[in-house]
Amino acid sequence: MLFPTEFDVIVVGGGHAGTEAALASARMGAKTLLLTHNIETLGQMSCNPSIGGIGKGHLVKEVDALGGAMAAATDESGIQFRILNSSKGPAVRATRAQADRILYKAAIRHRLENQPNLWLFQQAVDDLMVEGDRVVGAVTQIGIRFRARAVVLTAGTFLDGKIHVGLNNYTGGRAGDPAAVSLSARLKELKLPQGRLKTGTPPRIDGRSIDFSKLDEQPGDLDPIPVFSFLGRAEQHPQQLPCWVTHTNERTHDIIRGGLDRSPMYTGVIEGVGPRYCPSIEDKIHRFASKESHQIFLEPEGLTTNEFYPNGISTSLPFDVQLELVHSMRGLENAHILRPGYAIEYDYFDPRALKASLETKAINGLFFAGQINGTTGYEEAAAQGLLAGLNAGRYVQEKDAWCPRRDQAYLGVLVDDLVTRGVAEPYRMFTSRAEYRLSLREDNADMRLTEIGRELGLVDDVRWDAFSRKRDAVSRETERLKSTWVTPKTLPPEEATALLGKPIDHEYSLAELLRRPGISYDGVCGLKGGECGPVEPLADEPVLLGQIKEQVEIGIKYQGYIERQANEIERNDANENTRLPDGIDYREVRGLSFEVSQKLNEFRPETIGQASRISGVTPAAISLLMVHLKRRGLGRRNGAAAETTEQGGDTVPTQQ
């Protein structure tokens, strides 16, 4: 049956990538259909009950700055909030929250059901409708055909998923949900390059059987309580709960080693590669054999359940081994396991077959986002989903794709890494992956992206109004600190000594004083009995006031470093944005080695910047490529047509 309504964009899958994709597409005015195998699992946290962390929290803030749902849903469902690396520099500080699974899922579903231009439909997708080199719709398991001009595929771990517990295995997309076997087979028919990856999850524990008196308590931050969204307030948070800490020991490790002969990972049953930075407990005791103990965090799953998530013991060992290893740890001697841990293998598709817009190079209008691209993590999925949904909507509206740069957003780093380097293992975001991380901080994600989001149609009036007030207040206050002066005559020596350690000997602006180590914004604003404070309130809301003060302080203290990084970005811009002609044959570039020309012809980079980051492409090869392009440009000056970048980059002649 052909469904009577035609849509602009169809999103397949209702996880973290799919929900952000559907919301983004609908926000910018595209008529969007979200197809999911089960409406009850929209926004489900399939693995750990947490959002954020180092690098990951940066992505969540960027999704929020672009109008996405993840941060706001976390503020409404978070039962513990912490700032990681709070004693370190602002570039690596990151927000992390424990979330109540039920509340988080409800917050996401509420947004989906109340988003204009968005329709939901419950049916698994078995096939894509493809005409020539473009996608035109999707077909469900009972044969309903939905037509659309673009499709965003966010299938997570469901593509030909296989669940392993010991040497037992069965098909499944996650515990309790069926795998997407037919859809996986259809994608293989389309000759898209694919492989297998693996991830895992730990056994869940009944909190009533845990002896908390033997554990170390880990509370969240309370003064102040962090928020995730730039529009968030601490009052939105539900009741806050602590996490708890225990440790593995030598007996635990002996139990694990004794079960490796029945481990699907160590007997070759699992062929997929697992995540390096979220290893199973089997991997940990094998890779870090000299380590006597590993820290395990017991994380509450919610306010209305006794279930705990033991972060750090992801495993696919047989259940009897899981039971024994859990009981070997302090506080868990009598623990009751509610759900066994398991590993899951699934299909992914080589992201080097994607454009930077996340559209497939082979099939027009088909976009991929999330674990199908070889990433791991809710946050990485949500960020890709937002970008894919946005660009699917722009594709339908016949507008140029928006592709964030590496110097613009962690989202830009994520996508550029995927489409230029591919993945050999599940990809996870870290701050260390960003070369411009001082400019890509959590605190300035809105300053970097909200204006762009407004232009793209992603940011509503409420967010825009709050952002505009913050932006203007930061600018005014920064200028005030630069233009407000204190002198030895106007600043009493005892007051200067209390703040600076000694009296001042000449005139200083408040900004100059603030640049000194250990001096805070509140400190300089309190000088002269508070006379140096702002004449007018910076903001009505305490959260917004805190954001403004933070922005002003960081901007002034790190001004020199930030300007130096901006100059470096400007120097690199020419190569980064120079687009390569679609039809170029790299075998014709004089001096390129066979290996380099083969890689460039295979992966078809869109810009010189992308080409420079492909493994094996040397700086010398880039120089040869630039010479080749300049020669052709000189030879085509007289009226030759030229191809320009979609984002305003340099002009490179097209090849004829």
Swiss-Prot record:
Q: Where is this region: Disordered?
A: 636-656
Residues binding NAD(+), per UniProt: 274-288
Q: Which Gene3D superfamilies match?
A: FAD/NAD(P)-binding domain, GidA associated domain, C-terminal subdomain, tRNA uridine 5-carboxymethylaminomethyl modification enzyme MnmG/GidA
Q: Where in the cell is it found?
A: Cytoplasm
Gene Ontology annotations of biological process type: tRNA methylation; tRNA wobble uridine modification
First and last residue of the signal peptide: none
Recorded GO MF terms: flavin adenine dinucleotide binding
Identify which cofactors the protein needs according to its UniProt entry: FAD
Binding, FAD: 13-18
Positions of disulphide bridges: none
Q: Which Pfam families match?
A: GIDA, GIDA_C_1st, SAM_GIDA_C
Bias kind Polar residues: ranges: 644-656
- Name the coiled-coil region(s): none
Q: Name one GO cellular component term.
A: cytosol
- Keyword terms, alphabetized: Cytoplasm, FAD, Flavoprotein, NAD, tRNA processing
Q: Does the keyword Cytoplasm apply?
A: yes
What InterPro entries does the record tag this protein with? FAD/NAD-bd_sf (IPR036188), GIDA_C_N (IPR049312), MnmG (IPR004416), MnmG-rel (IPR002218), MnmG-rel_CS (IPR020595), MnmG_C (IPR026904), MnmG_C_subdom (IPR047001), MnmG_C_subdom_sf (IPR044920)
Q: What does the annotation say about its assembly with partners? A: Homodimer. Heterotetramer of two MnmE and two MnmG subunits.
- What is the similarity comment for this entry? Belongs to the MnmG family.
Primary role? NAD-binding protein involved in the addition of a carboxymethylaminomethyl (cmnm) group at the wobble position (U34) of certain tRNAs, forming tRNA-cmnm(5)s(2)U34.
* Protein name, UniProt field: tRNA uridine 5-carboxymethylaminomethyl modification enzyme MnmG
